Amino acid sequence: MHCGSTARIGPTEMKTISCSAGYGSGGLGQHLTQLVEEARGDGTLGGYFSGAPQADDESGIRVETTSSGWVFQYTPVRFSPAWKNFLGGDLLDRAVAARLTPGETFHGFNGQALHSFRRAQALGYRQLVLESATTHVDHVMRQQRKAHQLFGWEAGWMNETQRRKTLREYALADTIYVASQLSYDTFREAGVPDSKLRRRTLTVDPRFVPPAQPVGDGKFRIVYVGSVSVMKGIPLLREAFSRLTSPDAELTLVGGWGTRTMKHYLRDWQRLDPRVHIAPGDPLPHLQRADVCVHPSFTDGFGLAPAEALACGVPVIVTEDTGMKDLVQEGVNGYIVPTGDWEAILERLEQLLSKPLAMNTA
């Protein structure tokens, strides 16, 4: 069964939106931007909370949690991706709840909406809407265990405390928006009723377009865009790329690491293979020079980066547990590979190296 598309929110109800990401910053920030601009466009934006609202936007409310920064810098929390993730979202959630004023519809993101939802209920909000940027939390936990079994040297970003909080958010929400059929199916499998689920189609920033001229220098450029972690499948990409022996192949990781362990892992990788480059920052110039974008994630509710690659005319290799696989036409604009299978990634890379897809050579 495919997800429905008719929301229960009245067309004129004013929306208050909350998200930890900065406006337009990363995949989550792009998700926030889409919500804000859609509401602004139809005249229903009451305001939005963000760690970094758009500059000079009167509708944006900056939420500061810097007073708790010492927790992340000087306690054992700094060594735990899961606790850093939980506390970062929870501190913002509590700060938003403390500043929330009466309204009609409240939109929050998973893992950072429980206290805001409870406050919104007390203030008489008619609708509580949860934007799930991930698959169902139980699916995330299963995939995290799978990643840890293969590569146990970096902990995942989800812990049991975060899981319990997110399940409470599911229960309180009147409507849960998901961004892919994969996400929808994981919620159905977990027993969430169809009546509560809605599909939101995420869009790519229009600046992501094919280059005016192809590079054409004989290099085979592989690009990964996103956070550099075990859960995103970076060790799988290393296993595959290290066996791609072509001297014309090069790999660029566009993103940052979140743990010291990953930092050392990347340094070791670069020392052993000078074809590997790390380039945090804007992914657009890298995608416009790429021959393929690989997204080897163990789980992703959507995966904006490979969608941006497709918009640039670049074929993608994504896993079965990447939501944007909805957009992949096998053998036309990319390939879908089994999650956790570096050999399948290598096979597709070798195939693209010897015979590029037509979309990338037109």
What residues fall within each predicted segment?
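Nucleotide-activated donor-binding/catalytic signature segment of Leloir-type glycosyltransferases, i.e.
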Residues: K263-G281
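Short hydrophobic beta-strand element within catalytic cores of glycosyltransferases
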Residues: P315-V318
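Membrane-proximal helix-turn-helix segments that form the acceptor-binding/catalytic region
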Residues: D93-G103, L114-S116, H136, G152-I176
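Aromatic "clamp/platform" in nucleotide-sugar-dependent glycosyltransferases that forms part
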Residues: F298
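Acceptor-binding helix/loop patch of EC 2.4 sugar-transfer enzymes
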Residues: F72-A82, Q127-R164
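Glycosyltransferase donor-sugar binding loop
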Residues: V225, E250-H264
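Conserved donor-binding/catalytic core segment of Leloir-type glycosyltransferases
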Residues: V204-K232, R238-R243, T252
